[in-house]
A protein has these predicted regions:
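Extended, charge-rich alpha-helical interface modules
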Residues: 4-7, 11-116
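Internal alpha-helical scaffold of NAD(P)-dependent oxidoreductase catalytic cores
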Residues: 233-315
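NAD(P)-binding Rossmann-fold cofactor-contacting core
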Residues: 136-155
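Hydrophobic/small residue at the entry helix of a nucleotide-binding pocket
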Residues: 126-127
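Interdomain hinge/lid region at the active-site interface
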Residues: 298-374
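Rossmann-fold NAD(P) dinucleotide-binding segment
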Residues: 158-161, 165-208
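Rossmann-fold dinucleotide-binding core
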Residues: 197-201, 205-258, 271
């Protein structure tokens, strides 16, 4: 975006009345707010015109490479103008989301040669809704199967149609059963899940692959509120049908997302650290503060930099879906190992903290430092 050029306003001098100075500055802020909003309205009108041009050219609504370029320009402009690039990213994410909604309001575009009929099982959930918007934005025809506000209440009803691709976005506990039902759908569609754990799916997925079913397994490593995919990752697990895995990847390949292969059997061990351990540490942080009787509203104003960073992350974790977070812990076969490592590490650190010999504590910190900075 071009830098906004606003008319100058005479700012107060040091000799003027303080209250008058404050009023003048507030009026200036109000004027700037109005002009910014006018520019946003102009941007949305332009986005609508872009959407119309895309429809005429039969192009998908979203071009993630363009969005990545927009974000890069925003970060560069913020640095040049002397403010935090993260603020620019936040503003542009909201503008991009609004632009996409504006363009989706019109008839969906078609993707020549690549338009698919896709069914999302569990489509009324947060990730299911995100997937529908994502796939429709690329020009695919998408419907959902969900007893809560789905186009179909069951797979039996959805089975009256044929589908090119079926995406499983149900709660983790339902995935094995849902997979078996999806494999019975007519037309032999591509079937893949997006579950955050795979241990309970390894056997049924591999059996399905050996039976000739086109199955794969993906794991988007981002929240369903994500708008811009730059810097985001989707983990890709091959269940034994490489062609099916590649077909699933194609739905994401032309976006800014990174596709990262990971062996299906190793997925949950990695998630034990990436998800299970990180969730646990943040929940423990909040629980410990609560048990210490330290009220958060009193700590905030005097927070150290480290506390502020940790508290922000812990608060975000605490606000997430507790049912999902329990499933991530419960269904991961590596969870006992994670807690054993956490318990032994905590005990070693406790002993080091209470030991008058600082060398013991320095050794524990050294272990941590060598993990993050091996050389």
């Amino acid at each position: 975006m071009e830098a906004l050029a606003f008319p100058t306003t005479k700012l107060p001098t040091t000799m003027s009345d303080p209250q008058q100075d404050l009023d003048t500055l507030r009026q200036r802020v109000a004027q700037l707010d109005r002009e910014i909003l006018e520019k946003i309205a102009e941007r949305l009108r332009t986005s609508r015109s872009i959407g119309e041009a895309k429809r005429r050219a039969q192009l998908p609504i979203r071009d993630f490479r363009v969005e990545a370029s927009v974000m890069q320009r925003a970060r560069s402009a913020a640095r040049e103008l002397g403010f935090d690039p993260a603020l620019a990213e936040s503003v542009l994410e909201s503008l991009i989301e609004a632009a996409v909604r504006t363009q989706v309001e019109s008839q969906p575009v078609t993707q020549p040669g690549g338009r698919q009929h896709i069914l999302i099982v569990g489509g009324a959930g947060r990730m299911g809704r995100w997937l529908r918007g994502f796939l429709e934005g690329q020009g695919h025809s998408v419907e959902t199967c969900d007893p809560v506000d789905g186009d179909f209440a069951s797979l039996a009803q959805a089975g009256q149609r044929t589908w090119d691709t079926v995406v499983l976005s149900t709660p983790l506990a339902l995935l094995p059963e849902t997979l078996q039902e999806a494999l019975q759908l007519p037309g032999s569609p591509l079937v893949f899940d997006i579950g955050s754990l795979k241990s309970h799916l390894v056997k049924p997925l591999q059996e399905a692959a050996r039976a000739g079913h086109r199955v794969a397994s993906l794991h988007p490593m981002f929240a369903p509120g994500t708008v811009v995919l730059t810097g985001r990752t989707v983990l890709v697990c091959d269940a034994g049908q490489p062609d099916a895995t590649e077909q699933a990847c194609r739905l994401f390949r032309e976006t800014a997302v990174s596709l990262c292969p990971i062996p299906l059997a190793e997925h949950d061990q990695v998630m034990g650290g990436l998800l299970g351990l990180s969730h646990t540490v943040n929940l423990l942080f909040g629980q410990a503060l609560h048990r210490l009787g330290l009220r958060f509203e009193k700590l905030g104003p005097i927070a150290s930099t480290t506390f502020a960073k940790q508290a922000r992350t812990a608060a975000e974790v605490a606000a997430e879906n507790p049912e999902l977070y329990h499933q991530i812990q419960h269904f991961n076969q590596c969870t006992p190992q994670v807690y054993e490592a956490l318990e032994s590490g905590l005990e070693a650190l406790r002993q080091a903290a209470l030991d008058p010999d600082s060398e013991v504590f320095l050794a524990r910190m050294g272990e941590c430092r060598s993990y993050f900075f091996p050389d």
